[in-house]
Amino acid sequence: MENLVGLLRIRVKRGINLVSRDSNTSDPFVVVTMGSQKLKTRGVENSCNPEWDDELTLGINDPNQHVTLEVYDKDTFTSHDPMGDAEIDIKPFFEVQGTDIQELTNGTEIRRVKPSGDNCLAEESRIIFSNGKILQDMILQLRNVESGEVEIQIEWINVTGSSDF
């Protein structure tokens, strides 16, 4: 990847109150897209509250670019049914990556991110220092659907030779 500034590890933890697309349930999976990169979680059968706990890693060239998360109901013989989507604004997370972590204690809050028109946060999100890493836990409110949220965690991974902050 040209002009790679780092890697973004996205841990897709779980879905909350996702819509039912197959009678009383769904077989959801998540597709994460940024530019030409497209990754997906495994599917979870018969659940509107799936536990994925899958880790997906994207190469980041432009931290101003949004990451799109789409949830689908897996169908075997027909096209997958959409179950909502959300955008992840990684810019606030990227902006704190230059923080000097040597003086931080475990659990230190670095920044709070409030829900806004620039993100799909269902509630305020905290960027914290934990076990030597800067992490952000988020609950994303799905759009274009009756109900549903997805809980994720993001982590920045520096790449040798990438530009410094």
UniProtKB/Swiss-Prot annotation:
The modification N-acetylmethionine is found at M1. InterPro entries: C2_dom, C2_domain_sf, CAR1-11. Ca(2+) 1 binds at R21, D22, D73, D75, D81. Keywords: Abscisic acid signaling pathway, Acetylation, Calcium, Cell membrane, GTPase activation, Lipid-binding, Membrane, Metal-binding, Nucleus. Gene3D superfamilies: C2 domain (2.60.40.150). One of its GO terms (molecular function) is GTPase activator activity. The keyword Protease does not apply. Residues 1-106 form the C2 domain. Binds to PYR/PYL/RCAR abscisic acid intracellular receptors in an ABA-independent manner, both at the plasma membrane and in the nucleus. This is Protein C2-DOMAIN ABA-RELATED 8. It comes from Arabidopsis thaliana. The gene is CAR8.
